[in-house]
Amino acid sequence: MMTIVYVSNAGHTEQYAEMLSRKTGLKSLNINDAVKILPKGSSILLMGWVMGDSIQGYKKLCKMFDIKVICAVGMSKYSSKPESLRKTNSLPDDMPLFVLPAGIDVNKLHGFYKLIIKMMQNSISKKNGEKTISAEEKELHDILLNGRDSVSDEHLDDVEKWLSQYDFS
């Protein structure tokens, strides 16, 4: 049986993992519990939040488990491109990869990550006056400056469709 293993910082990835668990009946575990409970080589669906195109938890979990599919949870549908995620994380070409928009709540971030976002907010405030800003940049700017929660069941539709093709018992 496949298990959903998630790495969450501000709660968005955990919300997606719980939603998918309810919809599919797959067990959901955070990374700390998974490494203690699951036998080495277990089949997992990894849900990891994205920071700088790095899928959190991937490097650690790929050495321990058989990752069947990855859900990369980013700020918006524009914040992480699949090609860039594959390259940055050295993902195999045949690894199923889904990018889920989550949003951001700066108040739930901690330490280094909060500092990075604050620096990005300052940079964005300066760039907002430029006329050559794209729609994608404008959306990311809005999310960073004002926060957003984009977690939704509908974003899991393609993941569910992919899962329905396989028997992971």
Protein language model regions, located:
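N-terminal beta1-alpha1-beta2 submodule of the flavodoxin-like/Rossmannoid cofactor-binding fold
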Residues: M1-M64, K161-S169
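FMN-binding flavodoxin-like domain, especially the glycine-rich phosphate-binding loop
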Residues: V50-S169
